[in-house]
Amino acid sequence: MPKSSRTCRALCGVDAARVTRVPLLTRIVVAIDPAAGSGEHSDETGIIVVGKDAGGHGYVLADLSGRYTPTEWARAAIAAYRTHGADRIVAEVNNGGEMVEATIRMVDPGVAFTAVRASRGKVARAEPVAALYEQGRVHHLGALARLEDQMCCFAHDFDRDTAGYSPDRVDALVWALTELLVTPVAGEGIFEAYRRLAQQSAEGGP
């Protein structure tokens, strides 16, 4: 895990996204990137809470990521779901499959849940979210140092083996913002949505 660096966060532009309050939010999701294990040297489980306002801006509300057992991360995510009044939990199921949802249902059978499966690489999945940041459409409530450090170190040539860790917090962030803001318009596929966001970013549009 990279050390906290205020200078690094300033240079990569994350500080410019920081806010001290949020407007009325129309949707809130809790996103989970479950780790494959829970041992001392296992990756952490990413748990990120993000909201969306009526103007199409996203607000990163909390980072609850950490090294958990499956039951522990399910409890942490559901506690965040209740605390923030979220309307859905979104979880990657590449590691664990149906057991991810089953673990959550064991803690609270009534939560709204969406399973997502990664079919593209981490960098490719993050590109449309990076475009949202470039457009100034994503804001961080207060300081989220460990998430922001991961964001600043997550370049196009990121290599997990070289870095010595998985960008679990960034993965969860990407799933949350994709669920809220990377939504295809009618008749538009997800790749067309990605291209549309990239074009808006290049043109400086909303």
Protein language model features and the residues they cover:
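Short, surface-exposed amphipathic charged segments that create phosphate/polyanion-binding patches used
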Residues: 125-136, 153-157
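Conserved beta-strand -> loop -> alpha-helix junction used to position metal-binding or nucleic-acid-contacting
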Residues: 110-132
